[in-house]
Amino acid sequence: MKLLSRAGSFSRFYSLKVAPKLKTSAPGGVPLQPQELEFTKLPNGLVIASLENYAPLSRIGLFIKAGSRYENYNYLGTSHLLRLASTLTTKGASSFKITRGIEAVGGKLSVTATRENMAYTVEGIRDDIEILMEFLLNVTTAPEFRRWEVAALRSQLKIDKAVAFQNPQTRIIENLHDVAYKNALANPLYCPDYRMGKITSEELHYFVQNHFTSARMALVGLGVSHSILKEVAEQFLNIRGGLGLAGAKAKYRGGEIREQNGDNLVHAAIVAESAAIGNAEANAFSVLQHLLGAGPHIKRGNNTTSLLSQSVAKGSQQPFDVSAFNASYSDSGLFGIYTVSQAAAAGDVINAAYNQVKAVAQGNLSSADVQAAKNKLKAGYLMSVETSEGFLSEIGSQALATGSYMPPPTVLQQIDAVADADVVKAAKKFVSGKKSMTASGNLGHTPFLDEL
């Protein structure tokens, strides 16, 4: 199940060329019925999943366990540069041919990344999906990383990071992972400044050779025949076999990072280690997140109905924003609170929010509140898989994490199985756990961790 959090994903969009026409309509005008999701795991470990929905647009994604957590500490920023290198020259096509070819058929190539995975996705009219798939395979299996092309990406790398860091939340979340973990999940999503211009073609090749292996991949398609995907995977995605380099298990440590910059708004996040994705405890933390408040559910709403907002409103008369933070990974997780407040009121806002979580840990919650939180969580999950993009991402993420797919009805059953006591236990784990904190702004009135 995909958990909601403030951590985002990052994309680049490009385009490709014309392909043979495929017949998609049934003879005699017989209406076509959507098929069930098909799932296959090849002997080499590669997972294939597809759903033939007969939509006019097809979408294919190649998901790879190659997020920033797998970077060597000496080669940080490699996955960030890879996100920008999706249209560099390959053994089968020049950079111009890739870009011009996708444009010619009105297609789209996007590359997204999290700390766990990278996803290369092509989307276009189903009659042209074969040519888009050809470019997808070129980009992921046969990159050349010519030195002059890699060097030319330096300015894009700087701009990409600068644009992302205009949002204070990005810096807070990056610092939060840096201070919370000793390794793996501490690796940044964005290239460190000292590594700008120093990532070489050889480093990119090394990362691809050791992480873009068949056992670390999942090929997922919507609006595509399963037999076609299986044939493509067996023929073209078997170039690099094996498990690749094993990633280190994330080690939580806790700590504090404070950035004094004089901003009138103080952004602060306080978390403790929670649970890895895919187990009952992680579901309890997800329910707790929505119990406390995961953000407004009404456009331009002020989220006044959440427990956190109600608690903070009693302790501060100044404008603020507060929500629960929840991020789950394959071997760890973070849960806590995220606040935005006026500098003078930062202490009041943070303490009021923290005390509300303590109140839940002491059992001050009603079954009606827990049920409402479950309903919000279920609605959020169902809406996230309503679009083809969200559905594709969910299938790919599950395929990489577990090698299988859990349908929405099963996910909803697991959410319903969370008891009130499980939510209280999750809150207690946060309150008693070792904390990590990051804050930025004018921090004169922002408490330190030991002052909470």
Curated annotation (Swiss-Prot):
PROSITE patterns: INSULINASE
Tissue-wise expression: Expressed in the head region and flagellum of epididymal sperm.
Keyword set includes RNA-binding: no
Membrane protein topology class: Peripheral membrane protein
Modified residues (Phosphoserine): S367
Modified residues (N6-acetyllysine): K65, K198, K249
GO cellular component assignments: mitochondrial inner membrane; mitochondrion; respiratory chain complex III
GO biological process: proteolysis; response to xenobiotic stimulus
Residue stretch of the organelle transit peptide: 1-14
GO molecular function, one term: metal ion binding
Signal peptide (from-to): none
UniProt cross-references to InterPro entries, sorted A to Z: Metalloenz_LuxS/M16, MPP/UQCRC_Complex, Pept_M16_N, Pept_M16_Zn_BS, Peptidase_M16_C
Main subcellular location of this protein, as a coarse class: mitochondrion
Subcellular compartments: Mitochondrion inner membrane
Domain of life: Eukaryota
Pfam short name (any one): Peptidase_M16
Keywords: Acetylation, Electron transport, Membrane, Mitochondrion, Mitochondrion inner membrane, Phosphoprotein, Respiratory chain, Transit peptide, Transport
Summary of the function given for this chain in its UniProt record: Component of the ubiquinol-cytochrome c oxidoreductase, a multisubunit transmembrane complex that is part of the mitochondrial electron transport chain which drives oxidative phosphorylation.
Family: Belongs to the peptidase M16 family. UQCRC2/QCR2 subfamily.
Quaternary context: Component of the ubiquinol-cytochrome c oxidoreductase (cytochrome b-c1 complex, complex III, CIII), a multisubunit enzyme composed of 11 subunits. The complex is composed of 3 respiratory subunits cytochrome b, cytochrome c1 and Rieske protein UQCRFS1, 2 core protein subunits UQCRC1/QCR1 and UQCRC2/QCR2, and 6 low-molecular weight protein subunits UQCRH/QCR6, UQCRB/QCR7, UQCRQ/QCR8, UQCR10/QCR9, UQCR11/QCR10 and subunit 9, the cleavage product of Rieske protein UQCRFS1.
Protein name as annotated: Cytochrome b-c1 complex subunit 2, mitochondrial
Species whose genome carries this gene: Rattus norvegicus (Rat)
Gene expressing this chain: Uqcrc2
